[in-house]
């Protein structure tokens, strides 16, 4: 696995596209790690201090993710070094997408990512540059559909991603019009933990869980974990957190979901961050779902949780550990050897899978069909790992080996 990983990490990407905005200090990159299967996919992010190395490592990560979610294409990523709060943001994105539009018409598919919104920015702005849909390049390069079929599948994709959830089983409140895109990643994080317990002949019911981060992913993960019978005992967010050792009820978790302001936890009983960050890691818990920013979790925090009975980690965040390596750093390796660490590219592949589902062929557009497809994709990936490794450790190492064998 280590040799495969080194080979994969050190291989130069096929395409690097570099852009400097003529009107501001913005600079952007698209890195296409490979045109596996004729195309590549990966979102567009924006933040101050972003550099080409960040974009490259994310492109490599996307390629690994596609081995689970499909389609069987290469990984890519776009990044713009610019302040997303700057009022000139829209102009920067307009000029960026104009420059990158030939790639988007031919072999590169993109979407929203950190500080770039799929629905309000990516779709309308790429459309102005003559791109039918941000994923058009994946249709062109990989699926090669007939013109009529392409129109049909682009329609499916457009409606599917912004589809409002009508089935109360999948939504904290149907009246609030939450979309598939809002909920699917957190759903996958919860399902991954559930399937892992099932494949090992155990059940998630009654297991205690700590969720880190209460944005789209963390809040949805807490909602679905609670719904399936796990007991959420702690939530830690950037502003603070909450602890309830005998577990919050499903109603309480649903209320917290509905009360969150944007990506932030809101509660009258909020424990300040400095205090919760001391306490939460030594709570008794079986499940940990890191769903905040990347590279936050220290070995010390993990060891505390292992000491109080941690069993399974299901990653909502990409690379949640504070390692410098792209993939398999020392904290991750240490954790993988001690507990069942389900890697990000399995547990958080929900959104990528939804894209693949709508692109592959004409499909059912019901909530149940969409969510079941993601659940089944994650279940199969966990089953493949189990077929190679029936123990409860080395899960991530086994998963990487399965993925990299397809790529190297």
Which role fits each region the language model picked out?
Residues 1-20:
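Short, Gly/Pro- and small/polar-rich lid/capping loops
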Residues 23-36, 67-72:
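N-terminal glycine-rich anion-binding loops that anchor highly charged ligand groups
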Residues 50-54, 87-91, 95, 117, ...:
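Conserved active-site and cofactor/substrate-binding residues in soluble primary-metabolism enzymes
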Residues 68-72, 77-204:
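Glycine/serine-rich phosphate-binding loop and adjoining beta1-alpha1 elements at the start
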Residues 166-284:
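Glycine-rich phosphate/diphosphate-binding loop of Rossmann-like nucleotide-binding domains
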Residues 240-341:
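Rossmann-like adenosine-cofactor binding region
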Residues 306-408:
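Adenosine-phosphate binding glycine-rich loop
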């Amino acid at each position: 696995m280590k040799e495969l990983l080194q080979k994969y990490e050190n291989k130069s990407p096929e395409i690097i596209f570099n852009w400097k905005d003529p009107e501001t200090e913005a600079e952007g990159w698209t890195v296409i790690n490979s045109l596996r299967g004729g195309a590549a996919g990966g979102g567009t992010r924006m933040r101050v201090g972003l550099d080409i190395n960040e974009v490259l490592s994310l492109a490599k990560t996307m390629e690994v993710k596609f081995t689970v979610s499909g389609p069987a294409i290469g990984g890519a990523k776009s990044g713009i070094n610019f302040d997303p709060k700057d009022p000139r943001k829209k102009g920067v994105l307009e000029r960026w997408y104009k420059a990158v539009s030939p790639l988007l018409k031919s072999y590169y598919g993109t979407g929203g990512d950190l500080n770039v919104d799929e629905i309000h920015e990516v779709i309308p702005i790429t459309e102005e540059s003559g791109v039918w849909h941000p994923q058009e390049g994946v249709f062109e390069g990989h699926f090669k559909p007939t013109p009529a079929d392409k129109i049909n599948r682009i329609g499916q994709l457009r409606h599917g991603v912004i589809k409002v959830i009508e089935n109360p089983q999948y939504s904290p409140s149907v009246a609030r019009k939450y979309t598939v895109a809002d909920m699917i990643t957190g759903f996958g994080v919860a399902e991954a933990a559930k399937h892992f317990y099932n494949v090992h002949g155990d059940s998630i019911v009654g297991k205690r869980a700590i969720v880190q981060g209460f944005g789209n992913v963390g809040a949805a993960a807490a909602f679905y974990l609670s719904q399936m019978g796990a007991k959420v005992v702690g939530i830690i967010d950037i502003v603070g957190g909450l602890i309830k050792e005998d577990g919050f009820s499903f109603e309480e978790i649903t209320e917290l979901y509905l009360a969150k302001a944007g990506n932030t936890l809101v509660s009258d009983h909020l424990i300040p961050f400095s205090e919760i960050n001391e306490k939460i890691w030594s709570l008794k818990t079986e499940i940990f779902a890191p769903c905040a920013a990347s590279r936050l979790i220290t070995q010390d925090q993990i060891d505390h949780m292992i000491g109080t009975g941690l069993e399974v980690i299901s990653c909502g965040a990409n690379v949640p550990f504070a390692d410098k390596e792209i993939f398999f750093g020392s904290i991750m390796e240490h954790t993988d050897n001690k507990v069942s660490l389900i890697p990000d590219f399995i547990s958080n592949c929900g959104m990528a899978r939804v894209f693949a589902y709508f692109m592959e062929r004409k499909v059912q557009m019901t909530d149940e069909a969409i969510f079941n497809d993601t659940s089944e994709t994650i279940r199969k990936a966990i089953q493949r790992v189990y077929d190679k490794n029936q123990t409860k450790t080395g899960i991530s190492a086994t998963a990487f080996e399965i993925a990299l064998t397809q790529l190297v």
